[in-house]
């Protein structure tokens, strides 16, 4: 399972970094609509967090990214035996590391996927593949914890009860 997680994480990270490289050198000054005004490809450099929040505070965002990656490692260790949780967390890690890489080496995050839903300012944003990994991984992890974690916990308790009953009978 560990090898699978490493492979998944590396492949996803490579896809993210290649897509950012291609966007940076091929899309400057362009806006390519894909689905009307709702979805398109455009290149932007975001020196903040989501929606440009904390723009210009690269050092703070790097520190926050380091803390998030450490927390992610702790969560991964804690849930390492929960079925599929390590895969979901590998997806999150690929997203976190992709954006962390950008902040370290460029001072900003390279975004290229424009999403617009109506005229609402909170739904008009540009993101990247790493951001999508973050959302997918977090949602998958939440589903796994909600639906599989209790089963694993119960089976672990059953195994412990069985071993304790064997100790009593021996």
Model-derived features: positions:
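Alpha-helical transmembrane bundles and membrane-interface segments of multipass inner-membrane proteins
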Residues: 1-170
């Amino acid at each position: 399972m560990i090898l699978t997680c490493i492979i998944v994480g590396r492949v996803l990270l490579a896809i993210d970094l290649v897509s950012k490289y291609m966007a940076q050198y091929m899309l400057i000054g362009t806006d390519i609509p894909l689905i009307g005004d709702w979805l398109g490809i455009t290149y932007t450099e975001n020196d903040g967090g989501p929606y440009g929040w904390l723009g210009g505070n690269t050092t703070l965002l790097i520190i926050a990214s380091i803390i998030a990656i450490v927390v992610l490692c702790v969560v991964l260790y804690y849930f390492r035996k929960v079925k599929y949780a390590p895969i979901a967390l590998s997806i999150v890690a690929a997203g976190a590391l992709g954006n962390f890489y950008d902040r370290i080496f460029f001072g900003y995050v390279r975004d290229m996927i424009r999403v617009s839903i109506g005229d609402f300012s909170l739904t008009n944003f540009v993101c990247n593949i790493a951001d999508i990994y973050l959302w997918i991984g977090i949602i998958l992890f939440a589903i796994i914890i909600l639906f599989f974690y209790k089963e694993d916990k119960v089976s672990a308790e059953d195994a412990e009860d069985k071993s304790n009953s064997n100790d009593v009978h021996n």
